[in-house]
Amino acid sequence: YNFNYKNTTLPKMYLTGDTTNMTHEQTVPMGIEYISPNEDKYGQSFNTGIQNNPVRIQGTSSLQYVRHNYTIFLKDEYGADMFYNPYGEGSVAENVFCLKADYIESSHANNTGMAKFINDCVYDTKTPMQSENPNCRTTINGFPIEVYINGEYMGVYNFNHDRYSTKSLGYDYKKYPNMLVYEINSNSNVSAGAFYKYG
């Protein structure tokens, strides 16, 4: 109970706005306030102030679950992309993030935890982008966070890079025309047709 409802050590994110029409394809504008209890670990707090940040449901097979994942796009007060880095050294500023519920695996270890382990400890071959900027990554980064939507406590999520966090992952077809990036349209689809080119 205290961990979930009286926690002072985890960052908190508050999303405010009408979610009626939100789907995995349709964004809705929301206000976003982020409260960091420790700037060294979790970056600076911020409040976008107005409801102009596009937010949509994220995922494929997870769409059926009670708790959804969300992709958030940070915007400043003028509607321009707002770049932010809550992860510190080893990451770059982004404007696209994922709030990951990890509903089936609530320890939050196998998704972000495994990705961080692979990026930091296992895979040491550098991509072209990493050769230019060592803070770019081959996997997502993230940490646990409490999420509230319109005042309702949604639970402990992971505050991750999104798969469309192009600055962090080095997706630049103009700069690297031979780059190959593929997505899988569903975790349950193992056919060749499940793969499609990103971008």
PLM ranges: what are they?
Residues Y1-G199:
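Phosphate/dinucleotide-binding and metal-coordinating scaffold of catalytic cores
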